[in-house]
Amino acid sequence: VGPEIVTEAMLVLDKVGEKFGHTFNYNEFLACGCSIDANGVPLTEETIEICKNADSVLLGAVGGPKWDNQPSQNRPEKALLGLRAALGLFANIRPAMMYKALADACPIKPEIIGDGFDIVVCRELTGDVYFGEHGRRESTNNWGVVGYDDMNYSVYEVERIARRAFEM
């Protein structure tokens, strides 16, 4: 779905450009599942360098069931993580609004949402929850296989995301 989404997004951008007198120039490179198929890896150094020198990057869907059995270091989402790290993209900014007219559709209790809400969630994208050690191992207490996901964040990473959130 990645290339198909990007193709449609480019059509939309071109229409916006027509309306506002702007021309977009596109250079297409493979990443994620498409890159695994073509290059054997989710992200090539060439793609990283091209993205570093671009004004912006338009990325479609990351993967799909076709790549579910890839080793963890070669899964499609590794491209997304690699691009985030290479481009210094550390903040995921997610606005959320609930209008009073839609309150009945919200799973949050009415006494909590009141007349609705307008919040922004600022989430860290390059720290250890994404890059930390995770996997499966045999438990030491006969519980069978257990999963683990270690998360460690530096003071710098915590301060950086907090600063970004408070600057909004």
Q: Regions from the language model: what does each represent?
A:
Residues V1-E4, E18, T23-N25, L30-M168:
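Anion-binding alpha/beta catalytic cores of soluble intermediary-metabolism enzymes, centered on
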Residues A9-F20:
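A short, Lys/Arg-enriched amphipathic alpha-helix followed by its capping loop at the start of a domain
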